[in-house]
Each structure stands twice: as C-alpha cells, then as structure tokens.
Amino acid sequence: LPIYPIIFCEGDNDTFPLWYNQDTEEVRRDVRICNLSYAQTDWYIYQQQCPLYDAPGLPISWDQNQYQEGKNEYVAVRPELKKQIEALYQKHPEEARDSFGNDPYEIKNILKYWVFAEKQEFHVIPTDTINIYIDKDAVLRSGMMLPEAIRHLKGEELRDAIPDKLSISLKNIRLLTKVDLLMLEILANCNWERPLYMAISVGNSSKLKFD
C-alpha cells in the first residue's frame, strides 16, 4: 500500500487481525484502520481525528459538538428542495452564494450550511446528487492510475481530461447516517493524498455508491 492509506472495515474478523498486526507485530503503523461499525459513536470519531502510531488522524474537520451522541444520527435526503434553491440562485445569486456557497450541492457546503446549521429545519440533504470538486493537480501528483482512455495524454491536455467534480447519486436514498456523512467528509478532505480502501466485509449499504 502507498503511505498513510485509510482502510475502511466493518467486521471483527477483518478488524482484529489488522489491529494485531499494528499493535503487536508493528506492521505498517502508517495505515489508518477505520471500523465503520464503531464510526457512529462520538468517542470513536474523536479517536479517529487523533494521530495513532505513525498515521495521522483522519481528515475530519468536525467539532465534537457536531458529532456528539444524539446529533446528526440520521439526516433526511430532501431533493424536492432543489427547485427552491435553484430559484433563489436565479433571482438573488449573490444572496444565495452568501447563504449556501458557490455550489449548494458540494458536500462541504451541504455540511456547513445545512447539516451543521444552527436552525434545526436546515438539518437535511437538499439534493439527490452530491458534488465533490477534484483538485486536478493533486490527482496528477498522486501518481494514481488514470482511466486508459486518457493515459496517453500529456500536460494541459491530460489535466483538462480529468473531470472537474465527482458526483455521487443519492437517488432512492431517503436518509444518510452519521457514518455516511463521515465517509463523505473523509472523501472530500483526502484530496487524493491518502488512498482509501474498503475491506470485503463492508456491505453495500455502507458504501453509498462509492464503488
């Protein structure tokens, strides 16, 4: 594995051997193991924010009061709000950007202006498609394997061929859990610098549509 990867796992049969390898055998202590079964709890999220052995903490920017027990356990997906939001951006674009950011469907803006808003009525996901913007320079620095169709390109031509954003569909999904939000937060903040892996134990319901 590359340096400082993050492994999402879910079952004891996967997690305990990984912990043993790090704790006892001192193998790959730069790898961060995140058990999604525990990631719904505030104490575990706090642990994951902190460095462990040679691995930095997970890129989670949340304050403790935003993930404490009983907060944001489930957040409703409300795509019907898109019409109102888009109407606001058409009629009052400056006010809309001040209220919800340049792209109201970017995950960072959804968390900031909706999920973690002071007003309880804003604690929803106002779309069925979430956007994560791609730092193209970071992608190229990472050395990751690019799609075969663009591998032959060079320079600006290659950079232009990389999509501007990653869109994740929430179609037919009515609720996101705290764990779902956590994974989206990590994906948005990794910036192609820390590779993400999922153990085979992670069920489809825990993957959103990452695969």
What residues fall within each predicted segment?
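ER/secretory pathway lumenal C-terminal domains and tails of membrane proteins involved
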Residues: 1-4, 16-211
